[in-house]
């Protein structure tokens, strides 16, 4: 039995648009896909990433082809690797015939940490994002890492007869790189500049240590971003960066915030 003929379906996205307005980024957002990531210990972490995928749309096209973004993800191996990140981006730009493209891949990354006194080990998680961009064939990759730390207020310590208010802070480094850099290296640059780093598991001797460590190393939010920026300045694999710190104030119902941006090429 012959299959019934299917009438042609109009491709509305390819119809002209007359408003003379190009779109800088259009695509899909918040699609999840399994990924695998190598870590500095030689292991491989299997996790799930959230992808944002965009292309540039010229002024004369009405729309892009949204389904093709999903097809590009699914055409890759079941677990996408960081090594295949550039090829996915290039495939997206080619498939959609775009001048430029942008892909973000955000996932939890785990580091095994050792408590400072007892030596007990536990996992700490960090939010990591790889941001890839292609513009007229040129590929750039940016690494973004959110690092939780402890900050202790120098003013509170100075004016108080005992104690000082302290809190957890999120330090975010967004770095355009020119060579491979381990996520752990960025984490270490941040944690070394905090009042104290945080741990998943602490025993009582460890808790005493981190409390006293933070008290002996007070930092304003301004101190944290300046000290981290000083480390990023001397890291040759980093071309430009933004470092932000948000301190979730324990004595206020608001956060303290600071940011430094630098492009070393200028």
From Swiss-Prot:
Gene3D superfamilies: Urate Oxidase (3.10.270.10)
Keywords for this protein: Hydrolase
Record site feature (May be catalytically important), residues: 153
Pathway noted in the entry: Cofactor biosynthesis; 7,8-dihydroneopterin triphosphate biosynthesis; 7,8-dihydroneopterin triphosphate from GTP: step 1/1
GO MF term list: GTP cyclohydrolase I activity
Annotated catalysed reactions: GTP + H2O = 7,8-dihydroneopterin 3'-triphosphate + formate + H(+)
Any matching Pfam family: GCHY-1
EC numbers on record: 3.5.4.16
A Gene Ontology biological process term: tetrahydrofolate biosynthetic process
Family that this chain belongs to: Belongs to the GTP cyclohydrolase IV family.
Role noted for this protein: Converts GTP to 7,8-dihydroneopterin triphosphate.
Name this polypeptide is given: GTP cyclohydrolase FolE2
Species annotation: Methylobacillus flagellatus (strain ATCC 51484 / DSM 6875 / VKM B-1610 / KT)
């Amino acid at each position: 039995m012959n299959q019934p003929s299917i009438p042609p379906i109009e491709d509305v996205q390819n119809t002209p648009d007359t408003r003379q307005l190009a779109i800088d980024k259009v695509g899909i957002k918040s699609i999840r896909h399994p990924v695998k990531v190598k870590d500095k210990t030689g292991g491989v972490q299997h996790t799930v990433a959230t992808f944002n995928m965009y292309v540039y749309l010229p002024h004369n096209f009405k729309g892009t082809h949204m389904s093709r973004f999903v097809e590009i993800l699914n055409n890759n191996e079941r677990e996408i690797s960081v090594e295949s990140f550039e090829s996915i981006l290039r495939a997206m730009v080619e498939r959609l015939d775009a001048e430029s493209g942008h892909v973000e891949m955000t996932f939890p990354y785990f580091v095994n940490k050792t408590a400072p006194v007892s030596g007990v080990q536990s996992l700490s998680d960090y939010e990591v994002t790889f941001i890839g961009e292609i513009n007229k064939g040129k590929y750039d990759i940016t690494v973004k890492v959110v690092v939780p730390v402890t900050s202790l207020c120098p003013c509170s310590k100075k004016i108080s007869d005992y104690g000082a208010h302290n809190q957890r802070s999120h330090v975010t480094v967004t770095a355009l790189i020119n060579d491979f850099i381990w996520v752990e290296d960025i984490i270490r640059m941040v944690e070394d500049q905090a009042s104290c780093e945080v741990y998943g598991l602490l025993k009582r001797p460890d808790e005493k240590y981190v409390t006293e460590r933070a008290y002996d190393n007070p930092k304003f939010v301004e101190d944290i971003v300046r000290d981290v920026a000083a480390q990023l300045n001397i890291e040759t694999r980093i071309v430009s960066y933004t470092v932000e710190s948000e301190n979730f104030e324990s004595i206020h119902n608001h956060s303290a915030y600071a940011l430094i941006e630098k492009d070393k090429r200028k």
